[in-house]
């Protein structure tokens, strides 16, 4: 059985638009997962002063993976594209976050869904 998941993408280092385009391709290659739709790219300010603006997008995925398995796949894509997590809200080559996982509410140490930065 597949469910619909929404993934937020963001980058503010090393050609952000190209990072996101590569991430869309990688998302479509994840096991038991299909990229259904991709938003246009848009720009947002960094949460911390002095950092470059972020290029962002959202992907809709149909996946048969469990939430933590999808998270592991997203982190593998981040790592493949050189993402380094040095500081919270710091600059990122690529940041992939599960925003929604069907209608599930998850509160686990590694994963909180809906994503804690989503607002009604």
UniProtKB/Swiss-Prot annotation:
Stored SUPFAM superfamilies: 6-hydroxymethyl-7,8-dihydropterin pyrophosphokinase, HPPK
Reactions this protein catalyses: 6-hydroxymethyl-7,8-dihydropterin + ATP = (7,8-dihydropterin-6-yl)methyl diphosphate + AMP + H(+)
Alphabetized PROSITE patterns for the sequence: HPPK (PS00794)
Entry keyword set: ATP-binding, Folate biosynthesis, Kinase, Nucleotide-binding, Transferase
Disulfide bonds: none
Enzyme Commission (EC) number: 2.7.6.3
CDD domains with a match to the protein in the record: HPPK
Gene3D superfamilies: 7,8-Dihydro-6-hydroxymethylpterin-pyrophosphokinase HPPK
BP terms from Gene Ontology: folic acid biosynthetic process; tetrahydrofolate biosynthetic process
Keyword Cytoplasm: no
Keyword Transmembrane helix: no
InterPro entries xref list: Hppk, Hppk_sf
Domain of life: Bacteria
GO MF, one example: 2-amino-4-hydroxy-6-hydroxymethyldihydropteridine diphosphokinase activity
Pathway assigned to this chain's UniProt record: Cofactor biosynthesis; tetrahydrofolate biosynthesis; 2-amino-4-hydroxy-6-hydroxymethyl-7,8-dihydropteridine diphosphate from 7,8-dihydroneopterin triphosphate: step 4/4
Membership in a protein family: Belongs to the HPPK family.
PANTHER family on file: 2-AMINO-4-HYDROXY-6-HYDROXYMETHYLDIHYDROPTERIDINE PYROPHOSPHOKINASE
Role according to the record: Catalyzes the transfer of pyrophosphate from adenosine triphosphate (ATP) to 6-hydroxymethyl-7,8-dihydropterin, an enzymatic step in folate biosynthesis pathway.
Protein name: 2-amino-4-hydroxy-6-hydroxymethyldihydropteridine pyrophosphokinase
Annotated organism of origin: Pseudomonas putida
């Amino acid at each position: 059985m597949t469910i619909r998941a929404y993934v937020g993408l963001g980058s503010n280092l090393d050609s952000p638009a190209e990072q996101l385009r590569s991430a869309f391709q990688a998302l479509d290659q994840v096991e038991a997962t299909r990229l259904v739709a991709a938003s246009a790219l848009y720009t947002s300010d960094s949460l911390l002063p002095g950092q470059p603006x972020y290029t962002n997008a959202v992907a809709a995925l149909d996946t048969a993976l469990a939430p933590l398995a999808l998270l592991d796949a997203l982190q593998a894509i981040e790592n493949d594209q050189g993402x380094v997590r040095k500081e919270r809200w710091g600059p990122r080559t690529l940041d992939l976050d599960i925003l929604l996982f069907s209608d599930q509410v998850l509160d686990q140490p590694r994963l909180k869904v809906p994503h804690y930065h989503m607002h009604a």
